Amino acid sequence: MSKYYYLVAGLPELTLEDSKLSYTVADFKTELYPALSEDDKKLIDLFYLKFDNANVLKLLKDKDAAIDPRGNYSSEELAEYISQLKDGDEVSDSVFPSYLSTFISEYFSLPAEDGFLYEDRLAALYYAYAMECRNQFVSSWFGFNLTLNNILVALTARKFKLDIAPLIVGDTEVCEALRTSNARDFGLGTEVDYLEQLVKISETEELVDREKKLDQLRWDWMEVATFFDYFTVERLFVFLLQLEMIERWISLDKEKGNQLFRSIIAALKDEVQIPAEFR
């Protein structure tokens, strides 16, 4: 296992309440990423793939769309892979993640059913791919985040008396419980140790405060999970996750945040679907 004494020692201390940053997710990719071992680069790539996911969705809808430069692939690379897969060709897993190839192939070959959300299908494939990672922390992080997001969706759907099952992303045991259980705690009271905390957070009336509490829960979870990882790639992965959280809050003031989340809830009521932004 590689140790990154100088890299980690030089990282700034972060808190969720930070209102300014001297470092960004993009800076990490250009300045620190090149110093990582090849195996550790693959782990960090899992973080940046979330931007590739969004970019693929954009390009499938509009081949000339501007993409987020924080992804692992350029617009030219993505366009080439999309073209190959559209034509029925294969793209090697060594150059392009298998789950993205699967998703793009399905996009062109399978008819979309009513109410089908491509974002949900891609999210399910992404989480399954990341959770197969051999790094225990990284795999656990994606599992934790999938469970947290799905429980939130289930609680929201139950509140508005919607059918929960089609809104759950993934195929884990927790996913199955959320789809099928009518129990107050979905039968997960002993399996998900933060369930009651999550229920209380979901009942917070102030929407921005609720989202901040959720991010604090995520923040606390990753800090506990990597407590003994001092100079490892896990610490760098956590740094990236925390950077992204802070960047998002800096760019989203409270008033705009309230408007955003109210529009999400309104869409939920009107369309009987959980918008991708809510995940």
Task: List the model feature ranges, each with a label.
Residues 1-279:
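Extended alpha-helical surfaces
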